[in-house]
């Protein structure tokens, strides 16, 4: 079934909804009361640590500086809103893949595609295209199924996409899913040991080779 959205305009409304209903994902955006979205996301995470939180914000130099200096440990992902509605689907699928990948790789051998990129603007643009391609290929494959049950299984068996934003995160994901890794899509340079390393791709290729 398609996901259902509930929209609120203040942090107080969000906490009230979370208190009375179950939610699987929280998306924080700039709102009318000028509340800092990073602070609001952190406050919500304190009360609901098991619900993924995504910050979706228009991008600017100010936001870039904020992300570079902010403690984002309470936020699962930050995305740049570029006006593409398909980004919302990509966010939902990315969260689903993060939750389902351990069981699906162990039980039915689902494969993993690893995207390594630390630019919020780039992965916000790339993920919708990547998911669109994977889902279209999976739908074509599912058409060959004999019945609805087989079609569902084939759609569930599509490759899962994992996003790594640092060298350390990429190596951890690769080591976890080494036997199911279909491929790695990577930028040449990204964060390594807390600094931008222009040779990160070369470094990451070493532990990922057989």
Residue ranges and their predicted role:
Residues 1, 16, 121-132:
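Amphipathic alpha1 helix at the N-terminus of the CheY-like receiver
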Residues 1-25, 141-183, 190-191:
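Acidic, metal-coordinating helix/loop segments flanking the phosphotransfer/catalytic sites
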Residues 7-9, 31, 54-122, 139, ...:
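Output/docking surface of receiver
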Residues 19-20, 67-68, 91-92, 127-129, ...:
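Short coil/turn segments at secondary-structure boundaries
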Residues 22-24, 46-55, 180-182, 209:
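His-Asp phosphorelay/catalytic-motif detector in bacterial-type signaling
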Residues 35-39, 193-201:
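Acidic catalytic/metal-coordinating carboxylates
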Residues 43-44, 205:
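Hydrophobic positions in alpha-helices of CheY-like receiver
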Residues 202-210:
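Residue-level detector of conserved catalytic or cofactor/ligand-binding positions
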